[in-house]
């Protein structure tokens, strides 16, 4: 559960801290993730391989981000495309349709064009960034709208309120990459 009584600056500094009980260090220590033993068999559940999101630093960072966003949990990824592809694929299945804005990061566009067909996922790109262009692309099997604001690479701004309103009226989700 997130402690909402702490101020933002306190959360930035202290949330998710790793207590150094051995040496009483004040700052959370860094745990390198380069070499760890593999505990097989019964010990695998108790001591999972740290390279798979189990180092104390990864837990520290995810707890801090969750607290700063007033969320229960947060996931961290090694790259933006890992975050984008995981987020999209976790919310679609074969036969679903997603709408993407025309001005979209090239890596995301490439992912869509090379991977969606393998899984039977349909997609379309809007012909503009006006909210009406998003409405025009909605089909019976549309499950979501994916947008960037500002867009990459042209830094165009989309009307998040209007697009999310359209999505809500049709009971479809919106996903927003606001990296910039």
What annotation goes with each model-predicted range?
Residues 106, 131-132, 150-155:
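Short, small-residue-enriched loops and turns at beta-alpha junctions
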Residues 93, 138-145:
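Short acidic/histidine-rich motifs immediately flanking catalytic phosphotransfer sites
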Residues 35-82, 107-114:
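Conserved N-terminal alpha-helix of the aminotransferase class I/II PLP-enzyme fold
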Residues 24, 65, 83, 98, ...:
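Buried hydrophobic positions in well-ordered alpha/beta secondary-structure cores of metabolic enzymes
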Residues 90-107, 126:
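Conserved PLP-anchoring active-site segment centered on the Schiff-base-forming lysine
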Residues 123, 174-175:
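Hydrophobic beta-strand scaffold residues
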Residues 1-55, 63-64:
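N-terminal "arm"/small-domain region of PLP-dependent enzymes with the aminotransferase-like
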Residues 151-173, 180:
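Active-site core of PLP-dependent enzymes with the aminotransferase class I/II
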